[in-house]
């Protein structure tokens, strides 16, 4: 019979030790034994809470931006998948909350940003929230590391080459390799995007497809035949002072 006092002491000791480890080390620890795996599998444990409160900006934790990621562990994961301050146009900066990009009011420029982490395997979903005016062109989608992040003029930069795929929210057009790939979604009089709506982007690296959801409604597959390359969540914008947030959700739920 397990002594409950000893079990509690063991729990408290693990809690203290794991709180001082790096996140990569926690992943290794979860593979040591079943006991440690179950301990770390509690995504709202004090260990994940401690790491979340110490690594995430307070601005993000105070807002409702992370409403779709309910546990401390998923909030941490979303933060490490957020926009990269080192992989964006010079006219873009990432706000202190770590999840929102701000495009500076620079004339005759189109500017883009990519996430910190890209995907080549598995299925992934993330939310994009456009929190400012769209302007004449506002594109969400994916790109490889080779896709440009800035160009002259006001254009659909994302989708302008063979390294990027995008949905222009202003005109409801799909874009790739500089060509319009058709209207999207395939609905009569499809409603236009409203500022503040959450769009879910679904990347399936097994089926090589990209799809979108809006208001929990699946809009259909937008792109097929994606290449076997690492693909990154990406947006491109033209409107000065507009802001776009991105929250990584993990594996999409079917149904």
From Swiss-Prot:
Domain F-box intervals: 3-51
Predominant location: other
SMART domains, per the entry: SPRY (SM00449)
Keywords associated with the record: Neurogenesis, Synapse, Ubl conjugation pathway
Annotated metabolic or biological route of this protein: Protein modification; protein ubiquitination
Top-rank taxon, per record: Eukaryota
Pfam families: F-box-like, SPRY
GO cellular component: cell cortex; neuromuscular junction; nucleus; pole plasm; SCF ubiquitin ligase complex
Ranges in a coiled coil: none
Any GO BP: proteasome-mediated ubiquitin-dependent protein catabolic process
Residues annotated as domain B30.2/SPRY: 61-253
Function (record text): Required in the presynaptic motoneuron to down-regulate the levels of wnd and restrain synaptic terminal growth at the neuromuscular junction (NMJ).
Subunit record text: Component of an E3 ubiquitin ligase complex composed of hiw and Fsn.
Similarity remark: Belongs to the FBXO45/Fsn family.
Name of the featured protein: F-box/SPRY domain-containing protein 1
Species the sequence originates in: Drosophila yakuba
């Amino acid at each position: 019979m397990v002594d409950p006092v000893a079990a509690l002491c063991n729990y408290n000791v693990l809690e203290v030790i794991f709180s001082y480890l790096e996140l990569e080390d926690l992943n290794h620890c979860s593979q040591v034994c079943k006991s440690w795996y179950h301990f770390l599998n509690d995504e709202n444990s004090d260990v994940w809470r401690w790491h979340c409160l110490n690594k995430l900006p307070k601005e993000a934790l105070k807002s409702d931006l992370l409403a779709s990621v309910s546990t401390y562990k998923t909030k941490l994961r979303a933060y490490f998948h957020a926009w990269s301050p080192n992989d964006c146009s010079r006219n873009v900066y990432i706000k202190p909350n770590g999840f929102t990009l701000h495009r500076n009011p620079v004339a005759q420029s189109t500017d883009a940003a990519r996430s910190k982490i890209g995907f080549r395997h598995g299925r992934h979903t993330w939310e994009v929230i456009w929190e400012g005016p769209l302007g004449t062109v506002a594109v969400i989608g994916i790109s490889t590391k080779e896709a440009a992040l800035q160009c002259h003029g006001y254009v659909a930069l994302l989708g302008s080459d063979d390294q990027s795929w995008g949905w222009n929210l202003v005109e409801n057009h799909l874009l790739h390799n500089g060509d319009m790939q058709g209207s999207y979604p395939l609905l009569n009089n499809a409603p236009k995007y409203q500022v503040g709506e959450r769009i879910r982007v679904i990347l399936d690296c097994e089926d090589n497809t990209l799809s979108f959801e809006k208001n929990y409604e699946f809009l259909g597959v937008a792109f097929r035949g994606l290449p076997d390359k690492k693909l990154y969540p990406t947006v491109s914008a033209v409107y000065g002072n507009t802001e776009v947030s991105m929250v990584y959700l993990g594996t999409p739920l079917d149904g």
